[in-house]
Each structure stands twice: as structure tokens, then as C-alpha cells.
Amino acid sequence: MTSVSECFQSLRDRKQCGLIPFITAGDPDLETTAKALRVLDASGADLIELGVPYSDPLADGPVIQAAASRALRRGVKLEDVLNIVKGVQGDIKAPIILFSYYNPIFYRGIEAFLEQIKSAGVKGLVVPDLPLEEAETLLKPAAEMGIEVTLLVAPTSPIERIKAIAHQSQGFIYLVSVTGVTGMRTQVATRVEDLLKSLRNTTDKPIGVGFGISEPEHALQVKNWGSDAVIVGSACVKRLAQGTPEEGLKAVGEFCQRLKQAIQ
């Protein structure tokens, strides 16, 4: 399993747009999550975002909130999530990026949290509610441990703030395509194209676009606008939760293949 930066460099060398599916750990259950990581990897995922269930997920829309609630009701904890990551080491090529809110990190202690996720094999970290002003407290120790912390750029951010975020973000820059929470939308905001151009003038770091991408044609549109990767969350979580675990795995695998075909 390579680092996040190495994966993006490989994509760039091959002139390819990356696919980053997101799933919530523990939904519908831990065993299915482990299988889903393998299925996504085999179905074209270049990197995989794995969400740690949290009781107050402010950035998440109804689909991911519901998945997190189901996982929490089953008693899923960070340790369970990391055991899954450990269990798939050697089976998958795609680096795993952990998606966690800041409170569980702060509660455990930054150093202890980072040591835990590093030993499990996590390569990257996205913390949606991490303020830029406090980012250094996490970025510095994470970098020393080889974990890349990716920061989010909101479409409403002033240009100076965008520059500051782009400068500090590690691995890639996570461009939020819409204001508000994650979720499936019928179209991708055309403002994303302008934001991508603005970011390109600011940094040469890879850019991944997420929030609101729910169809292969959305992924292709974002790729054509110049994104280095497309991030698809709610649409994957919804499919994985459909029917039996076996049906969910089949649905999310086929969807991932369709997304990959669209951007190749």
C-alpha cells in the first residue's frame, strides 16, 4: 500500500484521474466493511476513504448520517475500524484515508491517535471540522509519522484562505463542490470549474473534488474540469446498505466500476 502522495504521483504520471470512494465503517456490519474495502480496491478505486462513525457528523448529509447512526447502534468503535484496516493490509493496493471528526482525535490525544492509526496501516486523514488555525497541531506530528492530513477548501472560502489551506494541505487538496453537507445531487455546481482554475493558479498539489458527486456523468464532468480525483461518498454508502450484505457489495462494486470507466 503506497502513500497518498505516491498514489497521486502515479496517477499524474499515467495522466489519469483518480477515483476515491467513501464508505462508513461498520455499516451494515464490520465484516461487510472489510469485504467492501477489497471489492472497491478490485473495482477500480485508487484510494479509499473510510469514515469513522461519529454521533454528531456536521458535514455529512442524511445518507452518511444514517449509516453512522446504524454503526454506532451496533457499538462500532475506532478500535474496530482500525482492526478492519489491519485485516486488509496486503490484500489491497489502494491507500486508506481515514475520515474522522476532530473530537475523537482530541479525546484520545493527538499523538496516541496518530500512533494507533499508523500502526493499523492508515495512510491519510481527513478531519472535516478541523479549523485551519488549529491545523498545525495535527499536521506536524502526522507528517512526522508519515500520515498525510488533507484539508478541505469550501466554495465560500476567500482567496487568501484558499491559498493558506492549499499551502498546508498534505497528500492532496479536498475541494468541496457545494456549500452545506455531503449528499447526492442531480448536478454538480458549475462554480467548481472556476474554483479548480483558481486553485491551479495557487498550487500544483493534486486536487480531489467531493460532496454531491453521485453519477458517472458527474465524475466525468469534474474530471474534464481538471480535477485530479473524484470523491464519491453518499452514493456508495447508499448502495452498500441496499438489501443483503452480498447484494450491497455487488451494487457498490458495479457502481465503482462504472465510475472508473467514466473517468478513464
Curated annotation (Swiss-Prot):
What is this enzyme's EC? 4.2.1.20
Alphabetized, the UniProt keywords read: Amino-acid biosynthesis, Aromatic amino acid biosynthesis, Lyase, Tryptophan biosynthesis
Name the residues annotated as catalytic in the UniProt entry.
E49 (proton acceptor), D60 (proton acceptor)
Q: What is this protein called?
A: Tryptophan synthase alpha chain
Please name the HAMAP family in this protein's record: Trp_synth_alpha
Residue stretches in coiled coil: none
Of which family is this protein a member? Answer: Belongs to the TrpA family.
Source species of the chain:
Crocosphaera subtropica (strain ATCC 51142 / BH68)
Q: What does this protein do?
A: The alpha subunit is responsible for the aldol cleavage of indoleglycerol phosphate to indole and glyceraldehyde 3-phosphate.
Subunit description: Tetramer of two alpha and two beta chains.
Q: Which GO terms describe its molecular function?
A: tryptophan synthase activity
Can you supply one Gene Ontology CC term for this chain's record? Answer: cytosol
Q: What does it catalyze?
A: (1S,2R)-1-C-(indol-3-yl)glycerol 3-phosphate + L-serine = D-glyceraldehyde 3-phosphate + L-tryptophan + H2O
Pathways involved: Amino-acid biosynthesis; L-tryptophan biosynthesis; L-tryptophan from chorismate: step 5/5
Q: Which Pfam families match?
A: Trp_syntA
**PROSITE patterns with a match to the protein in the record:** TRP_SYNTHASE_ALPHA (PS00167)
